[in-house]
Amino acid sequence: RRLLKDLDIRINQIIPEGGSVEDSKNLPKARFNLIPYREVGLMTAMYLNKEFGMPYVSTTPMGAVDMAECIRQIKKYIDTLAAPILSSKRVDYESYIDGQTRFV
């Protein structure tokens, strides 16, 4: 949660935390899925990708290298989704990555 909040990304749902069958109807509203632990949620993300074309990031943001890779993958999806709307502006998370990994 903190990572997405720091990146100013709104969370649609956290599954299975507090989720219900009723809440599952909102799953396709997400722009992409973040699967921080491949053991939990990867098959669901693969299904949503197949059925709804919803991309997912499955790199666990743990450790400096993987956190940076995860953020760069998120950036790629955000830039792709925003391209038709924000033709000249892209998100830039490199300063955040630098701040989080500089002294590791």
Curated annotation (Swiss-Prot):
Enzyme class: oxidoreductase
GO cellular component terms, A-Z: chloroplast
Enzyme Commission no: 1.3.7.7
Transmembrane segments: none
GO biological process, one term: photosynthesis
Pathway: Porphyrin-containing compound metabolism; chlorophyll biosynthesis (light-independent)
Gene3D superfamilies in the record: Nitrogenase molybdenum iron protein domain
Annotated localization: Plastid, Chloroplast
Stated name of the protein: Light-independent protochlorophyllide reductase subunit B
GN (gene name): chlB
